């Protein structure tokens, strides 16, 4: 009998402090519905579900016919399951890490280096940069999902410099004036001026940052108490960030970066060197397998200011331009494909109405990981003897060139996300 190449996984949960608590967390809810024995602690955060082979959260195989305990062990001994191109391109490794995130309090403002810089940083400071890989990532909202992403249009930043004197004070008059003057210039002049402004902010003395932030918080609080709307300078968000990270330089970053609220199904793609921060909500995320992060604020952790200011992409764009749009499949009316301009990963979203009784997950020349977000099915493949029941929160590994038939066991809509590598 052929060894199974499609099998369910038990995946690692990360309980970082910023995660949503207990059953408020989509991560915890997915876990509870896929595993009847799972005990959800209501006083603990459930931040991330990791689906992949990362050493800090290698998925366990739930198939007693398979001798290997973890997905990375199995892939190491079944290399053809990756797909020939994936195996050759990524040295026999699964190139992506697939996740669900449930965010209650903001994550740090950060950017990820490109491959060239990652190699250099890893050599120079392996304690801060643990590998030599780049880390592009994509987030697709499951619930309304708020984040900061990329530099705003310069006109918006200039407006904040006028309306927020504390922000202008930290940037300095010279850099602020220069930014206003370059608004109509070419993109290189704008980028250079923007870099100068951002660097001035990031290199401000801690004491001065705390003073200016306290002035701003006091001003917003007084105006809000008097019944004035302060949303033109994101008053509510600033107070919230300051409460969570008092005196943190990152509180001022909201005046530099686009604020996005993604509706379910909307996505943002974060290429190398783009500053970003997740603020609140639940999402599916996929990324290249790396842990390299250069932080910029909203964090008690190490901030590498010189590297950050040097590496960032200072290309302004509007918030609507930061949305990453999927393409609808021509062959499959239920399938949307989020295919970013990097080779490491692609996400497929499948929405099947409950009135349909069966659905076929097509074979790909790539290993893939499938997550059931909604629905209940029985999965079978031409090579498996035993059908696999899957419900909300269920995770399935699908070897390259394997198709899977799903039989809906309830008349409820299906929502499925599948991470793969389309080379």
From Swiss-Prot:
Modified residues (Phosphoserine): 102, 108
EC id: 5.3.1.8
GO biological process: GDP-mannose biosynthetic process; mannose to fructose-6-phosphate catabolic process
Pathway linked to the protein: Nucleotide-sugar biosynthesis; GDP-alpha-D-mannose biosynthesis; alpha-D-mannose 1-phosphate from D-fructose 6-phosphate: step 1/2
Superkingdom assignment: Eukaryota
Catalytic residues in the record: 295
GO MF annotation list: mannose-6-phosphate isomerase activity; zinc ion binding
Residues annotated with N-acetylalanine modification: 2
CDD domains found in the cross-reference section: cupin_PMI_type_I_N (cd07011)
Catalytic activity: D-mannose 6-phosphate = D-fructose 6-phosphate
Cofactor descriptive note: Binds 1 zinc ion per subunit.
Subcellular location as annotated: Cytoplasm
Disulfide bonds listed in the record: none
Stated role: Isomerase that catalyzes the interconversion of fructose-6-P and mannose-6-P and has a critical role in the supply of D-mannose derivatives required for many eukaryotic glycosylation reactions.
UniProt name for this protein: Mannose-6-phosphate isomerase
Organism encoding this protein: Pan troglodytes (Chimpanzee)
Species lineage: Eukaryota, Metazoa, Chordata, Craniata, Vertebrata
Gene it is expressed from: MPI
């Amino acid at each position: 009998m052929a060894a199974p190449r499609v099998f369910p996984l038990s995946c690692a949960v990360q309980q970082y402090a910023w995660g949503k608590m207990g059953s408020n967390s989509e991560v915890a809810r997915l876990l509870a519905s896929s595993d009847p024995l799972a005990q959800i602690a209501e006083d603990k955060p459930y931040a991330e579900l990791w689906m992949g082979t990362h050493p800090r959260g290698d998925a366990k195989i739930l198939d007693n016919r398979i001798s290997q305990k973890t997905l990375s062990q199995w892939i190491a001994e079944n290399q053809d399951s990756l797909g020939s191109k994936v195996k050759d391109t990524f040295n026999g490794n699964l190139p992506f890490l697939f996740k669900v995130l449930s965010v209650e309090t903001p994550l740090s403002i950060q950017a990820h280096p490109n491959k060239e810089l990652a190699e250099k940083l890893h050599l120079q400071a392996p304690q801060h940069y643990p590998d030599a890989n780049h880390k592009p990532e994509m987030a697709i909202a499951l619930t309304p999902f708020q984040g900061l992403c990329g530099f705003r249009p310069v006109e918006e930043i200039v407006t904040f410099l006028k309306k927020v004197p504390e922000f202008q004070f930290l940037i300095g008059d010279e850099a602020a004036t220069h930014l206003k003057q370059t608004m109509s210039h070419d993109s290189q002049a704008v980028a250079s001026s923007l870099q100068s402004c951002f660097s001035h902010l990031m290199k401000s003395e801690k004491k001065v940052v705390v003073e200016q932030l306290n002035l701003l918080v006091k001003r917003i609080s007084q105006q809000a108490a008097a019944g004035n709307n302060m949303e033109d300078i994101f008053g509510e968000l600033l107070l919230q960030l300051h409460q969570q990270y008092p005196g943190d330089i990152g509180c001022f970053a909201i005046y530099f970066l686009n604020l996005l609220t993604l509706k379910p199904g909307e996505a943002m793609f974060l290429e190398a060197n783009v500053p970003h921060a997740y603020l609140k909500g639940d999402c599916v995320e996929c990324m290249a397998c790396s842990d390299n992060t250069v932080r910029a604020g909203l964090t008690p952790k190490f901030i590498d200011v010189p590297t950050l200011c040097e590496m960032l992409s200072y290309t302004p764009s509007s918030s609507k331009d930061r949305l990453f749009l999927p393409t609808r499949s021509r062959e499959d009316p239920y399938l949307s494909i989020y295919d970013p301009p990097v080779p490491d990963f692609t996400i497929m979203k499948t929405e099947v109405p409950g009135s349909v009784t069966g659905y076929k997950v097509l074979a790909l020349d790539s290993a893939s990981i499938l997550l059931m977000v909604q629905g209940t099915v029985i999965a079978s493949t031409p090579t498996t003897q035993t059908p696999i029941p899957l419900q909300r929160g269920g995770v399935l590994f699908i070897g390259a060139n394997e198709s899977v038939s799903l039989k809906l066991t309830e008349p409820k809509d299906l929502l499925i996300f599948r991470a793969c590598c389309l080379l």
